[in-house]
Swiss-Prot record:
Superkingdom of origin: Bacteria
Function: The glycine cleavage system catalyzes the degradation of glycine. The P protein binds the alpha-amino group of glycine through its pyridoxal phosphate cofactor; CO(2) is released and the remaining methylamine moiety is then transferred to the lipoamide cofactor of the H protein.
Family, per entry: Belongs to the GcvP family. C-terminal subunit subfamily.
A GO term for molecular function: glycine dehydrogenase (decarboxylating) activity
UniProt cross-references to HAMAP family, sorted A to Z: GcvPB
Subunit annotation: The glycine cleavage system is composed of four proteins: P, T, L and H. In this organism, the P 'protein' is a heterodimer of two subunits.
Residues bearing the modification N6-(pyridoxal phosphate)lysine: K273
Reaction(s) this enzyme catalyzes, per UniProt: N(6)-[(R)-lipoyl]-L-lysyl-[glycine-cleavage complex H protein] + glycine + H(+) = N(6)-[(R)-S(8)-aminomethyldihydrolipoyl]-L-lysyl-[glycine-cleavage complex H protein] + CO2
Assigned GO CC terms: cytosol; glycine cleavage complex
Alphabetized Gene3D superfamilies for the sequence: 6.20.440.10, Aspartate Aminotransferase, domain 1 (3.90.1150.10), Type I PLP-dependent aspartate aminotransferase-like (Major domain) (3.40.640.10)
Name of the protein: Probable glycine dehydrogenase (decarboxylating) subunit 2
Organism, as annotated: Bacillus cereus (strain G9842)
InterPro entries: GcvPB, GDC-P_C, GDC-P_N, GDC_P, PyrdxlP-dep_Trfase, PyrdxlP-dep_Trfase_major, PyrdxlP-dep_Trfase_small
Length: 491
């Protein structure tokens, strides 16, 4: 459906209108033809909109008012940890000594920034129970891939070239099998048992001499803690494999439990989730990777070291997998995460987990009478419901999500994990008040009653948004990803 009341920026163009004027040329003019080969020079002008600065401001301000973010409302996306990002993070990230430096500066001139990076690494080592950390990876999936490449390098250095398989649970994040594939591994699925945890017998069945690693989130994507994690680690390690920790759900165990103490060999973190770097909208993110001692030689170079003369980057890493990102990671997000960790302290981080778990369990118990609860036990930071009973009445989980838009809420994650029918995954985080949770819960209960009494209201939702229902089939099969200038009218 076309958005009728908000013209595209291309549709408000007026030939000859400008938004910015360049100063008069005060140097000798250089022709493009004298600098670039003809293959690199446009034959026709780019079809850019011709608009004033005021046009631009009003257009994008109007669009921004339709966006939904953590600062504007509740954002209960499961497995995304959409917590409030403290604004002190932004103030610190804008310090001139952080914002105005360049990665190609001499190390002697950026010792303060390097000290922050080193201290952040030390904090993450303590939080995760790993032996060292690299800040290079730029996001969660990037961290996954980096960690898997480290595992691959480790096995190959030990002559284990036949370890070509990575095991992932059927409840795993979709990035896990994708990262394994990109890293050159074959993915093997291990089933969950009736309690929503990894089936140990199935794990024993699939682990063998070809196993490179088991990728695991703990608590898992169902919001359940893998209580047999020590036995799982023993199974994998006895077979010569490594245990990989997907840090997407670390918010559930901060200062309560550490991946390193559970037997994990590699961990990636999402600083843009757990440690309040703003996320959503494409980035930037930060996905540091921590490892145990036997994987340190393969970490991407350079690594940051502290000596009696200060901080420096060590490039002398003959066994390293190489670089995984230009320079040293997304520094601005690292500054925000460091600020958050120092502001909270160990007791504050422990409270983060306590309130995140409390909020999730409160919501789960209040909603359980109205939606199916696949796993009736205490959850951690998130939980899953099922819309199976609503589906029997002709209303899909997608319809429920659309109906929530009418009340100003961003919908939860739906249809994931894949092993729960009509899945609704909710993560409230620790930063939401009871009043906010109750408001959302009340609307979820209202929707459940509407399904029983007046299902058409839910099936046809949303009713109050500017854009209603999209043709999802056409959007998937024939997406319109760029503006096409209308053909000139023939007269």
């Amino acid at each position: 459906m076309k958005n009728q009341d908000q013209a595209l920026i291309f549709e408000v163009t007026k030939e000859g209108r400008v938004g910015y004027s360049l100063p008069k040329l005060d140097v000798e003019e250089v022709k493009l033809e004298d600098v670039f080969e003809s293959d690199y020079i446009r034959v026709e002008d780019a079809e850019l909109p011709e608009v004033s600065e005021l046009d631009i401001m009003r257009h994008y301000t109007a669009l921004s008012n339709r966006n939904h973010g953590v600062d504007s409302g509740f954002y209960p996306l499961g497995s995304c940890t959409m917590k409030y990002n403290p604004k002190i993070n932004e103030s610190v990230a804008r310090f001139a000594g952080f914002a105005n430096i360049h990665p190609l500066q001499d190390e002697k001139t950026v010792q303060g920034a390097m000290e922050l990076m080193y201290d952040l690494q030390e904090h993450l080592i303590e939080i995760t129970g790993m032996d060292t950390v690299t800040l290079q990876p730029a996001a969660g999936a990037h961290g996954e891939w980096t960690g898997l490449m480290l595992i691959r390098a480790y096995h190959e250095a030990n002559g284990d070239f036949n370890r070509t398989k990575v095991i992932v649970p059927d409840s795993a994040h979709g990035t896990n099998p994708a990262s394994a594939t990109v890293a050159g591994f074959e993915t093997i699925t291990v089933k969950s048992n009736e309690n929503g945890l990894v089936d140990l017998e199935d794990l024993k069945r699939v682990v063998n001499e070809e196993t490179a690693a088991l990728m695991l989130t703990n608590p898992n994507t169902l919001g359940l803690f893998e209580e047999n994690i020590l036995e799982m680690a023993e199974i994998v390690h006895n077979a010569g494999g490594k245990l990989y920790y997907d840090g997407a759900n670390l918010n559930a165990v901060l200062s309560q439990a550490r991946p390193g103490d559970m037997g994990f060999d590699v961990v990636h973190l999402n600083l843009h989730k757990t440690f309040t770097g703003p996320h959503g909208g494409g980035g930037p993110g930060s996905g540091p990777v921590g490892v145990k001692a036997d994987l340190i030689p393969y970490l991407p170079k350079p690594i940051l070291e502290k000596t009696e003369n200060g901080y420096h980057f060590n490039y002398d890493r003959p066994e390293a997998i190489g670089r995984v990102k230009p320079f040293y990671g997304n520094f601005g997000i690292n500054v925000r995460a460091y600020t958050y960790i120092r502001s909270m302290g160990p007791d504050g981080l422990r409270a983060v987990t306590e309130y995140a778990v409390l909020n999730a369990n409160y919501m789960m118990r209040r909603l359980a009478p109205f939606y199916d609860l696949p796993f009736n036990r205490h959850c951690k930071h998130e939980f899953v419901l099922s819309g199976r009973r609503q589906k029997k009445l002709g209303v899909r989980t997608l319809d429920i999500a659309k109906r929530l838009l009418d009340f100003g809420y961003h919908p939860p994650t739906i249809y994931f994990p894949l092993n729960v029918e009509e899945c609704i995954m909710i993560e409230p985080t620790e930063t939401e008040s009871k009043e906010t949770l109750d408001g959302f819960i009340d609307k979820m209960i209202q929707i459940a009653k509407e399904v029983e009494e007046n299902p058409e209201v839910v099936q046809e939702a949303p009713h109050t948004t500017v854009i209603k229902r999209l043709d999802e089939t056409m959007a998937a099969r024939k997406p319109v990803l760029r503006y096409a200038k209308p053909a000139p009218v023939q007269v």
